[in-house]
Amino acid sequence: DWELIAIDDHSTDLSCKILSEYQKKDNRIKVFKNLKNGIIDALRLALEKSNGSYITRMDADDIMANIKLEELIQLLLKHKKGHVATGYIKYFSTNKKLNDGYLNYEKWLNCLTAEHSNFSEIYKECVIPSPCWMISKSDLIQIGGFNTNTYPEDYDLAFRMYYGKLKVIGSKNILHYWRDYPERTSRTNPVYSNNTFPKIKINYFLKNELNQKKMLLLWGAGKKSKAIAHLLVQNKIEFSWITNNPKKIGKTIYGRKIFNCNTFEVPENSQLIIAIASKSFQPILKLATIKDTYRFC
C-alpha cells in the first residue's frame, strides 16, 4: 500500500487543481498547500502529514520508474532498519541537450550505487540522489528529519544519513528519471550555487572529522581550494597550504603562504584535504600514503 502526500509550494500552473481532482477519486492521494515557502518547509509539512512507515520523495517534474517503490521497499524489508535504499538515476531533458556535468554526475553516482559505496565519497558531492531514496520513517526522524535549515538540503540530509551510521543499499535498475531544464530550482536559486558546497563540507568536517592532534594539510590552490582555505581561516583553524602549481607556490592568500607540495616536509601524523578538480590530477606518493584523507573535489 502507499500514500501520496502532494505539497503545493505556491505553484502557478494547474498542478494543484489536477491533483485535487485525483484526490477525490483516490483517498490515498492527499494534497496540502505550503503556507510557508520553499522546499524545506514543503518537506517538513509532507513528513508531518505522512502516515506510512517508509518515506521517499521526488519533485513533481521528474518521472519514476514503474518498479521504483516496489524495488526500494523490498530492499528495506530485506535489510531492515539502519539502511537507506537508492537506485540508478538517469537525467533527461525535453528542450535542451544535457551538459557533461550532469552526465558525469549520473555516471559517478550510479557507479557508487552499484557498489553500495556512496558514502565513501561523501565530501566530493551529494552521494544520495535527492529524488531517489527510501528510508524508514523512524530512521529519518532519528537523524533529524527535515528540521535543519541548511542548503543544499539534499546534501545536508546525505551527511546526516552518513553520520547517523545508516548503510546504503542500492539497486542496479534505473529507478528515477531526473529532469533538467533552464528554470530548474537548482539552477536559479542561489542557495544551490557551488558557493554553498564548500561551507557545508567544512561545517561537517570540523564537527566530525578534524583532529586537533594532527597537522591539517590543504592541497590545491584553485578556486575551490581558495574557498575552503577562506572558511578554515574564518573558523581559526590551523593548516598548511600546499600545491604543485608553480604559479601559486610562494604566494600568500588570506594570510597563508602556499608551499610546494613536492618539497614540503609532511608530518607522519597528518590530515589531508584534497581540493583539486583537475581530471589529470595525480597523487604524490608521500601524500597518497596519508590515511586520513578527504577528497573535496
Question: What kind of region is each of these model predictions?
Answer:
Residues 67-102:
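Conserved donor NDP-sugar-binding/catalytic core segment of glycosyltransferases
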Residues 34-50:
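Glycine-rich, basic loop-to-helix element that forms the pyrophosphate-binding segment
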Residues 55:
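Short aromatic/hydrophobic "clamp" motif used to bind/position activated sugar donors
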Residues 88, 103-125:
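Short, flexible, basic/aromatic active-site loop/helix in glycosyltransferases
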Residues 88, 168-175:
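Catalytic beta-strand/loop signature of glycosyltransferases that borders the donor
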Residues 8-17, 59:
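A conserved acidic beta->alpha catalytic loop
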Residues 173-181, 187-212:
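Catalytic core of nucleotide-sugar-dependent glycosyltransferases
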Residues 151-157:
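Acidic donor-binding loop at a coil-to-helix junction in glycosyltransferase catalytic cores
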